[in-house]
From Swiss-Prot:
<dbReference type="InterPro" id="IPR000206">
    <property type="entry name" value="Ribosomal_bL12"/>
</dbReference>
<comment type="subunit">
    <text>Homodimer. Part of the ribosomal stalk of the 50S ribosomal subunit. Forms a multimeric L10(L12)X complex, where L10 forms an elongated spine to which 2 to 4 L12 dimers bind in a sequential fashion. Binds GTP-bound translation factors.</text>
</comment>
<keyword id="KW-0689">Ribosomal protein</keyword>
<dbReference type="InterPro" id="IPR036235">
    <property type="entry name" value="Ribosomal_bL12_oligo_N_sf"/>
</dbReference>
<dbReference type="GO" id="GO:0003729">
    <property type="term" value="F:mRNA binding"/>
</dbReference>
<protein>
    <recommendedName>
        <fullName>Large ribosomal subunit protein bL12</fullName>
    </recommendedName>
</protein>
<dbReference type="GO" id="GO:0006412">
    <property type="term" value="P:translation"/>
</dbReference>
<dbReference type="InterPro" id="IPR008932">
    <property type="entry name" value="Ribosomal_bL12_oligo"/>
</dbReference>
<keyword id="KW-0687">Ribonucleoprotein</keyword>
<dbReference type="InterPro" id="IPR014719">
    <property type="entry name" value="Ribosomal_bL12_C/ClpS-like"/>
</dbReference>
<comment type="function">
    <text>Forms part of the ribosomal stalk which helps the ribosome interact with GTP-bound translation factors. Is thus essential for accurate translation.</text>
</comment>
<comment type="similarity">
    <text>Belongs to the bacterial ribosomal protein bL12 family.</text>
</comment>
<dbReference type="Pfam" id="PF16320">
    <property type="entry name" value="Ribosomal_L12_N"/>
</dbReference>
<dbReference type="Pfam" id="PF00542">
    <property type="entry name" value="Ribosomal_L12"/>
</dbReference>
<dbReference type="GO" id="GO:0003735">
    <property type="term" value="F:structural constituent of ribosome"/>
</dbReference>
<dbReference type="GO" id="GO:0022625">
    <property type="term" value="C:cytosolic large ribosomal subunit"/>
</dbReference>
<dbReference type="InterPro" id="IPR013823">
    <property type="entry name" value="Ribosomal_bL12_C"/>
</dbReference>
Length: 122
């Protein structure tokens, strides 16, 4: 019996963020692909000045010496449970939040760095 697209979407919607990360990794391995965004060439000719990036991804690069404080900060920022936050922190580098505004990204970066983490905005 083949699954319908609707059944697949419902199954994915029920998964946690950590389970989705594992699923994406499994897809990458099985199909030998990368989930990284494809770079698009800028239009040639009289292109206007490059627009400032409006959406950022907050990436936890390293948790540093104070892992417990970083886990607490991650839980606070993402709403994840203790185990999910711990797994995310220990799996660094990991993207914590995607598509956030520059202000929200900078605020989250500041909180995590105060807890001892190394964070980058991309």
């Amino acid at each position: 019996m083949a699954l319908t697209n609707e059944e697949i979407l419902n199954a994915v919607a029920e998964k946690t963020v950590l389970e989705l990360v594992e699923l994406i990794s499994a897809f990458e391995e099985k199909f030998n692909v990368s989930a990284a965004a494809v770079a698009v060439a800028a239009p040639a000719g009289g292109a206007a000045a490059a627009e400032e990036q409006s959406e950022f991804n907050v990436e936890l690069t390293s948790f540093g010496a104070n892992k417990v404080a970083v886990i607490k900060a991650v839980r606070e920022a993402t709403g994840l449970g203790l185990k999910e936050a711990k797994d995310l922190v220990e799996g660094a580098p990991q993207v914590l939040k995607e598509g956030v505004s520059k202000e929200e990204g900078e605020e989250l970066k500041k909180k995590l760095e105060e807890a001892g983490a190394t964070v980058t905005l991309k």
